[in-house]
Amino acid sequence: MEKKIYDLNLECREWQNKMAFYEDDIKIMQGRVEEVNSKNSATEVRAMIEHFQNQLILQKEQIDIVKKKVKQQINALEAGIEKNPVAADHRSVEDATALRDEVETFEKIFNELRKELITFMAKWM
C-alpha cells in the first residue's frame, strides 16, 4: 500500500509527538508510584510497586525504540525528497504499516498499564 510522502511525514510527526507525551506521562506515573511507595510498607504494595516500576522502565525502553524507528522513517522520507525534489508532495511511497501497527500496539499496552496503575493508586493512596 502506498501513501503520499506529505501524509506519511505528517503521520510520523504525530507519532513523535505521541511518544513525547508518553515520556512525560511515564515521569508523572513514576512520581505517583514513588508517592505510594513512601506511604505504604505492606508486602503486597511493595510487590506491586516493583511491578509498576519494572513496567514503566520497559515502556520507556519501548518508547525509545519506537522513536528511533520513527526518526529513521522521517530521515528516509527526507532523503527521498532531497534525491528527487520534483513534485515531492504528489509522490507516493510505501506506507509504514508495520510502524503504524507498532505505535498502535504500544498505545494499547501503555493505556492498559495506565488503567492498572490508576486502579492500584486508588486503592493505596
Can you describe what each PLM-predicted range is?
Residues 1-125:
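Charge-rich amphipathic alpha-helical interaction elements
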